[in-house]
Amino acid sequence: MKKIPQISDAELEVMKVIWKHSSINTNEVIKELSKTSTWSPKTIQTMLLRLIKKGALNHHKEGRVFVYTPNIDESDYIEVKSHSFLNRFYNGTLNSMVLNFLENDQLSGEEINELYQILEEHKNRKKE
């Protein structure tokens, strides 16, 4: 797994668009982000440049536009950020996080049943 750079929340929104398309040009990134944000094209281009400098994106020129591809996998990013979150707030244990949600009534009965099912399926796969 590659080293994961620090990515701001805004930059993460840009990365999500690029992960979704895997290869996308500047105009398409701007068009996609204009659906969900009020950022100007210049702001989006600045974020793209920052992500390149951080090593999160690769780019090359095709004709008159730049094409961007992710340099880090979305699954790797999520894994690192998930572990960071657990370490930061729950001393690295998933049990503590789930217990916190249970104790604060933040999980419905349906969600608890779904978690139970997931755990059972995972347990059965481990046995095989």
UniProtKB/Swiss-Prot annotation:
For this protein, the record's Pfam families field holds: Penicillinase_R
Q: Is Phosphoprotein given among the entry's keywords?
A: no
Any one biological process term the GO annotation gives: response to antibiotic
Domain of life, per UniProt, equals Bacteria
Modified after translation how?
A: Upon exposure to beta-lactams, proteolytic cleavage at a single site may impair dimerization and abolish repressor activity.
Keyword Transcription regulation set for record: yes
Q: Where is this site: Cleavage?
A: 100-101
Q: Please list where the region (Important for dimerization) is annotated.
A: 73-128
Tell me the protein's name: Penicillinase repressor
Q: What does the record give as the organism's lineage?
A: Bacteria, Bacillati, Bacillota, Bacilli, Bacillales
Give the gene name.
Answer: blaI
